[in-house]
């Protein structure tokens, strides 16, 4: 946006940025206490408990933005066949390809024919950019078929805050189901670089180790 403002000589304040789905009205911010700058984060500081309560999840893993999990999760599986329901956020397919997986970008009508040949299915719900919302029952049916073979259903719920009734957060303790949530978009606080992975304990522990 700054580059465009410079190129067209239009003040930054006069632009409406439609290139990203971040709310332009940030959540009201209190004064930041000094200890937030001087102390290391702690696992019992209330962040995880607050996130579990908000999302309705049994457990969460805080992330430096959901992008951290998008890049790390493909490294936790051996090379396999990954279906990415497209169109969607391009970093998903890119990350799985970079980790050596065979990635097929599929349309909604192709899920049923291809599902039983996949090791991982990735769904962005609600979809970005189409806005399509998949109902939990349909996603859980896909998850059951994948999980029987040791597969994963990975659901990116970065834009789910407006339609929480469609979230799989409450089911995220099931083996082979991973839900990603973004904090910055809905609350307009992208600079915080905060996201969460929701899943069963062993998987979240493995992800934490992968992230270091």
Positions of PLM-derived features:
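Helix C-cap/helix->beta junction micro-motif
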Residues: 99, 148-149, 174
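Active-site phosphate-binding strand-loop segment of PLP-dependent enzymes
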Residues: 104-162
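Short, conserved active-site loop motifs that form the nucleotide-linked donor/cofactor pocket
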Residues: 60, 151, 176-177
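Conserved core segment of the aminotransferase class I/II
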Residues: 179-212
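Structural scaffold positions in well-ordered secondary structure
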Residues: 18, 156-158, 180, 195
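Short glycine-rich anion-binding loops that position phosphate/pyrophosphate groups of nucleotides
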Residues: 21-27, 66, 125-130, 160, ...
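Phosphate-binding glycine-rich loop
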Residues: 44-82, 88-89, 93-95, 99
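N-terminal "arm"/small-domain region of PLP-dependent enzymes with the aminotransferase-like
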Residues: 1-50
């Amino acid at each position: 946006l700054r580059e465009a403002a410079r190129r067209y000589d239009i003040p930054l304040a006069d632009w409406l940025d439609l290139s990203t789905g971040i709310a332009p009205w940030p959540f009201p911010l209190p004064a930041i206490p000094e200890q937030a700058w001087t102390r290391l984060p702690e696992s019992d500081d209330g962040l995880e408990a607050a996130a579990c309560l908000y999302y309705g999840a049994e457990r969460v893993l805080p992330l430096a933005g959901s992008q951290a999990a998008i890049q790390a999760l493909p490294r936790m599986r051996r090379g396999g066949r990954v279906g990415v329901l497209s169109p969607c956020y391009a970093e998903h397919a890119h990350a799985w390809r970079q980790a050596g997986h065979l990635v097929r970008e599929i349309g909604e009508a192709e899920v049923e024919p291809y599902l039983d040949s996949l090791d991982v299915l990735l769904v962005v719900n609600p979809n970005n950019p189409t806005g399509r919302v998949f109902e939990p029952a349909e996603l859980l049916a896909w998850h059951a078929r994948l999980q029987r073979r040791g597969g994963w259903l990975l659901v990116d719920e970065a834009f789910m805050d407006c339609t929480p009734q469609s979230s799989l957060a409450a089911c995220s303790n099931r083996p082979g189901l991973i839900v990603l949530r973004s904090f910055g978009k809905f609350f307009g606080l992208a600079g915080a670089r905060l996201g969460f992975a929701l899943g069963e304990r062993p998987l979240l522990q493995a992800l934490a180790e992968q992230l270091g």
